[in-house]
Amino acid sequence: MTKTLTKHLQAIKAEGKGLFIPYIMAGDHDKGLDGLFDTISFLEAQGVSAIEIGIPWSDPVADGPVIELAGQRSLVKGTSLASIIARLQEKKTQVPLVIMTYFNPVFQYGVETFVADLQNTSVKGLIIPDLPHEQESFIKPYLENLDLALVPLVSLTTGLERQKELIEDARGFVYAVAINGVTGKTGNYRDDLDKHLKHLTEIAQIPVLTGFGVSTLADIKRFNQVSDGVIVGSKIVKGLHEGMQEEIKDFIYAGSHYQK
């Protein structure tokens, strides 16, 4: 199966719009998890394509300082993977949700139980940045025949054969990493980035979204020209935490209503 997320994104593409997926950290709110659906509703109102929800973890190897701090704020409030899933089971959302988590919390929760419990939520995609493709067998058998896509990350350092392998096996969408390193790093894009993104978009049968370092309107325009859209994390997380709703509202609107 694993169709809902891809079909939803492809329908937006068919309207000539760029895709825009914001990232939020679950529990990073004045009200903790009680504010999760408030944030989701706010983002849905701006016309986002889907919403990526981060699971806080004590050793976030792929997170930049903004998201790492957000995770720490969430953990201090007592947020856990179990409490997040329980909250997500309370209410369905208008757009698909994508969980971004490290593998350790999933392993501790129980992989089979984790996948089963997500079936009663609006989560249609999973991103596990520290789970190598060769070790996806830890979770893939539990995803068979379920509407839950394991989204691959493809970076500039991924070899051509490896790219082909990842994309042929991809579900949901392809997460194209614009900058090597942690999230939130901006600028300093490699000269061959646009060529790389165009190549991925040409060979993939599902949408390709660009993330890591996307933080300006110029980034949105640039990456919509060479891929299907963008994923924005640090700018959204920082804006929500600092109460800059109107500023990020305009930014999100520009991204979610970008006309190809």
UniProtKB/Swiss-Prot annotation:
Q: List the disulfide bonds.
A: none
As recorded in UniProt, its EC number(s) are 4.2.1.20
One Pfam match, given by its short name, reads: Trp_syntA
Any one GO MF annotation of this record? tryptophan synthase activity
Q: Which residues form the active site?
A: 52 (proton acceptor), 63 (proton acceptor)
Q: Which GO terms describe its cellular component?
A: cytosol
Pathway(s) it belongs to: Amino-acid biosynthesis; L-tryptophan biosynthesis; L-tryptophan from chorismate: step 5/5
Q: Which domain of life is it from?
A: Bacteria
* Coiled-coil ranges from the UniProt annotation: none
Per the record, what are the reactions this protein catalyses? (1S,2R)-1-C-(indol-3-yl)glycerol 3-phosphate + L-serine = D-glyceraldehyde 3-phosphate + L-tryptophan + H2O
Sorted alphabetically, the keyword list is: Amino-acid biosynthesis, Aromatic amino acid biosynthesis, Lyase, Tryptophan biosynthesis
Q: How does it assemble?
A: Tetramer of two alpha and two beta chains.
| Described purpose of this protein according to its UniProt entry | The alpha subunit is responsible for the aldol cleavage of indoleglycerol phosphate to indole and glyceraldehyde 3-phosphate.
Q: What family is reported?
A: Belongs to the TrpA family.
The protein, known as: Tryptophan synthase alpha chain
